[in-house]
Amino acid sequence: MSSVVETVTDLVTPILQDHDFYLYDLEFVKEGKSWYLRVYINKDGGITLEDCALVSDELSEALDNVEPDPIPQAYFLEVSSPGAERPLKKEEDYQRAIDHYIHISLYQQINGQKVYEGTLTQLSDKEITLDYLDKTRHRQITIDRQKIAQARLAIKF
Protein backbone atom coordinates (compact mmCIF):
# COMPACT_ATOMS: atom_id res chain seq x y z
CA MET A 1 0.00 0.00 0.00
CA SER A 2 2.83 2.43 0.70
CA SER A 3 4.00 2.00 -2.91
CA VAL A 4 0.51 3.10 -4.05
CA VAL A 5 0.74 6.18 -1.83
CA GLU A 6 4.25 6.95 -3.11
CA THR A 7 3.27 6.46 -6.76
CA VAL A 8 0.15 8.61 -6.47
CA THR A 9 2.08 11.29 -4.55
CA ASP A 10 4.60 11.41 -7.40
CA LEU A 11 1.78 11.67 -9.96
CA VAL A 12 -0.34 14.27 -8.17
CA THR A 13 2.45 16.62 -7.02
CA PRO A 14 3.15 18.20 -10.45
CA ILE A 15 -0.60 18.47 -11.13
CA LEU A 16 -1.06 20.37 -7.87
CA GLN A 17 1.99 22.58 -8.49
CA ASP A 18 0.61 23.57 -11.92
CA HIS A 19 -2.44 25.03 -10.15
CA ASP A 20 -0.67 26.45 -7.05
CA PHE A 21 -2.28 23.81 -4.81
CA TYR A 22 -0.51 21.58 -2.32
CA LEU A 23 -0.98 18.02 -1.10
CA TYR A 24 -2.28 17.98 2.45
CA ASP A 25 -2.61 14.22 2.85
CA LEU A 26 -3.12 11.06 0.83
CA GLU A 27 -4.40 7.66 1.89
CA PHE A 28 -5.26 4.36 0.25
CA VAL A 29 -7.58 2.40 2.53
CA LYS A 30 -10.01 -0.49 2.46
CA GLU A 31 -13.39 0.11 4.06
CA GLY A 32 -15.71 -2.85 4.01
CA LYS A 33 -15.25 -4.48 0.61
CA SER A 34 -14.22 -1.29 -1.20
CA TRP A 35 -10.87 0.46 -1.66
CA TYR A 36 -10.61 4.26 -1.50
CA LEU A 37 -7.85 6.51 -2.75
CA ARG A 38 -8.34 9.76 -0.84
CA VAL A 39 -6.39 12.83 -1.87
CA TYR A 40 -6.69 15.88 0.37
CA ILE A 41 -5.61 19.11 -1.30
CA ASN A 42 -5.50 22.76 -0.33
CA LYS A 43 -4.27 26.19 -1.40
CA ASP A 44 -3.84 29.56 0.22
CA GLY A 45 -7.33 30.99 0.63
CA GLY A 46 -8.98 27.57 0.59
CA ILE A 47 -9.89 24.99 -2.01
CA THR A 48 -13.14 24.98 -4.01
CA LEU A 49 -15.30 22.18 -5.36
CA GLU A 50 -14.18 23.13 -8.87
CA ASP A 51 -10.54 22.81 -7.78
CA CYS A 52 -11.22 19.30 -6.46
CA ALA A 53 -13.00 18.29 -9.67
CA LEU A 54 -10.12 19.63 -11.77
CA VAL A 55 -7.51 17.67 -9.81
CA SER A 56 -9.71 14.55 -9.80
CA ASP A 57 -10.00 14.65 -13.61
CA GLU A 58 -6.28 15.25 -14.17
CA LEU A 59 -5.18 12.65 -11.61
CA SER A 60 -7.62 10.07 -12.97
CA GLU A 61 -6.19 10.55 -16.46
CA ALA A 62 -2.61 10.33 -15.15
CA LEU A 63 -3.41 7.11 -13.25
CA ASP A 64 -5.00 5.59 -16.36
CA ASN A 65 -1.80 6.23 -18.34
CA VAL A 66 0.65 4.59 -15.90
CA GLU A 67 1.99 1.17 -16.91
CA PRO A 68 1.93 -1.14 -15.07
CA ASP A 69 -1.23 -0.08 -13.27
CA PRO A 70 -0.19 1.05 -9.76
CA ILE A 71 -3.64 0.13 -8.40
CA PRO A 72 -4.77 -3.13 -10.03
CA GLN A 73 -7.91 -3.54 -7.91
CA ALA A 74 -11.07 -1.46 -8.28
CA TYR A 75 -11.14 1.68 -6.11
CA PHE A 76 -12.94 4.96 -5.62
CA LEU A 77 -10.96 8.17 -6.16
CA GLU A 78 -11.93 10.98 -3.77
CA VAL A 79 -10.31 14.41 -4.02
CA SER A 80 -11.35 16.87 -1.33
CA SER A 81 -10.40 19.61 1.07
CA PRO A 82 -8.94 18.45 4.39
CA GLY A 83 -11.83 20.28 6.10
CA ALA A 84 -12.22 23.29 8.35
CA GLU A 85 -11.06 21.40 11.45
CA ARG A 86 -8.21 19.59 9.74
CA PRO A 87 -5.62 17.74 11.81
CA LEU A 88 -2.16 19.24 12.17
CA LYS A 89 0.16 16.39 11.22
CA LYS A 90 3.24 17.79 9.53
CA GLU A 91 5.50 20.70 10.39
CA GLU A 92 4.05 22.69 7.47
CA ASP A 93 0.56 22.23 8.95
CA TYR A 94 1.71 23.80 12.21
CA GLN A 95 3.46 26.62 10.33
CA ARG A 96 0.26 27.43 8.42
CA ALA A 97 -1.70 27.35 11.71
CA ILE A 98 0.27 30.18 13.34
CA ASP A 99 -2.18 32.96 14.33
CA HIS A 100 -5.10 30.53 13.88
CA TYR A 101 -7.42 29.04 16.48
CA ILE A 102 -6.51 25.42 17.27
CA HIS A 103 -7.59 22.52 19.49
CA ILE A 104 -4.91 20.57 21.39
CA SER A 105 -5.38 17.25 23.22
CA LEU A 106 -2.59 16.23 25.57
CA TYR A 107 -1.35 12.85 26.77
CA GLN A 108 -1.30 14.14 30.36
CA GLN A 109 -2.87 17.08 32.14
CA ILE A 110 -1.10 20.40 32.39
CA ASN A 111 -2.52 22.76 35.03
CA GLY A 112 -5.42 20.34 35.51
CA GLN A 113 -6.43 20.30 31.81
CA LYS A 114 -5.94 17.77 29.03
CA VAL A 115 -7.55 19.90 26.31
CA TYR A 116 -6.74 23.46 25.27
CA GLU A 117 -8.23 25.68 22.59
CA GLY A 118 -6.67 28.96 21.62
CA THR A 119 -4.59 30.86 19.11
CA LEU A 120 -1.25 29.36 18.15
CA THR A 121 1.15 32.28 18.58
CA GLN A 122 4.61 30.69 18.57
CA LEU A 123 6.14 27.51 17.29
CA SER A 124 9.55 25.91 17.69
CA ASP A 125 10.96 22.42 17.18
CA LYS A 126 10.29 21.57 20.82
CA GLU A 127 7.20 23.55 21.90
CA ILE A 128 4.19 25.64 20.96
CA THR A 129 2.72 28.70 22.62
CA LEU A 130 -1.02 29.11 22.80
CA ASP A 131 -3.09 32.15 23.81
CA TYR A 132 -6.32 30.90 25.34
CA LEU A 133 -9.27 32.14 27.37
CA ASP A 134 -9.58 30.88 30.96
CA LYS A 135 -13.13 31.89 31.86
CA THR A 136 -12.81 35.63 31.19
CA ARG A 137 -9.03 36.01 31.37
CA HIS A 138 -6.58 35.73 28.51
CA ARG A 139 -3.72 33.41 29.36
CA GLN A 140 -0.71 32.02 27.59
CA ILE A 141 0.70 28.51 27.87
CA THR A 142 3.79 26.92 26.36
CA ILE A 143 3.42 23.20 25.71
CA ASP A 144 6.14 20.67 24.92
CA ARG A 145 5.29 19.20 21.50
CA GLN A 146 5.96 15.66 22.74
CA LYS A 147 3.05 16.05 25.17
CA ILE A 148 0.58 16.72 22.33
CA ALA A 149 -1.55 13.69 21.51
CA GLN A 150 -3.56 15.42 18.81
CA ALA A 151 -3.81 18.88 17.28
CA ARG A 152 -6.23 20.34 14.75
CA LEU A 153 -7.59 23.62 13.52
CA ALA A 154 -10.75 24.63 15.38
CA ILE A 155 -13.67 26.92 14.74
CA LYS A 156 -14.00 29.64 17.36
CA PHE A 157 -17.51 30.26 18.64
UniProtKB/Swiss-Prot annotation:
Gene3D superfamilies: Ribosome maturation factor RimP, C-terminal domain (2.30.30.180), RimP-like superfamily, N-terminal (3.30.300.70). Pfam families: DUF150_C (PF17384), RimP_N (PF02576). GO terms for biological process: ribosomal small subunit assembly; translation. It comes from the Bacteria. The keyword Acyltransferase does not apply. It is found in: Cytoplasm. CDD domains: YlxS_C. GO terms for cellular component: cytosol. InterPro entries: Ribosome_maturation_RimP (IPR003728), RimP_C (IPR028998), RimP_C_sf (IPR036847), RimP_N (IPR028989), RimP_N_sf (IPR035956). Keywords: Cytoplasm, Ribosome biogenesis. Required for maturation of 30S ribosomal subunits. Belongs to the RimP family. NCBIfam families: PRK00092.1-2. This is Ribosome maturation factor RimP. It comes from Limosilactobacillus reuteri (strain DSM 20016) (Lactobacillus reuteri).
